[in-house]
């Protein structure tokens, strides 16, 4: 998100600006760096002033005028936008598209392979419960409002969160999901470096379609 500054239209325009991130090593910031470097020849890590911190702190710094822009989780962004002071500069999905990368899963539940083999019924029960929740989130508008109230979200903010997040939930992996993840990794590795990712390549067999 950025303040309503017409001079900031792309991530490349963050050059020389103050920008808030929740972690310099996060995938979000690595994607932002990759787009800025490949599309606008800007190294955000060196050519912008980066402030790390939690989302509420970044919001407060934006309100104080100490930042020109900030990352914002989609559970926070609707409330910031509702103030009328901020607008969306780019979404993570926009950055992926700008890099010419395929849509890929972003967050995962991971299981130890040996445990899965030893407890297939438990694994299946978890996946079934996950499917139930995804179906609920995709179809039940009121569920978002009710859960939002528990999180102190006004109804209009919860509705904004619903609009932002609902389409991001995946119910199953596509047949090309593992290959797509590897392509994203290979594109971002030169930006982040193996020290951030903790490996230089993704091994085969990290996903299974057996429990879909």
Locate predicted features.
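Short secondary-structure capping/turn micro-motifs that flank functional sites
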Residues: 78-79, 96-97, 154, 164, ...
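Conserved C-terminal helix/tail region of periplasmic/extracytoplasmic solute-binding proteins
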Residues: 182-212
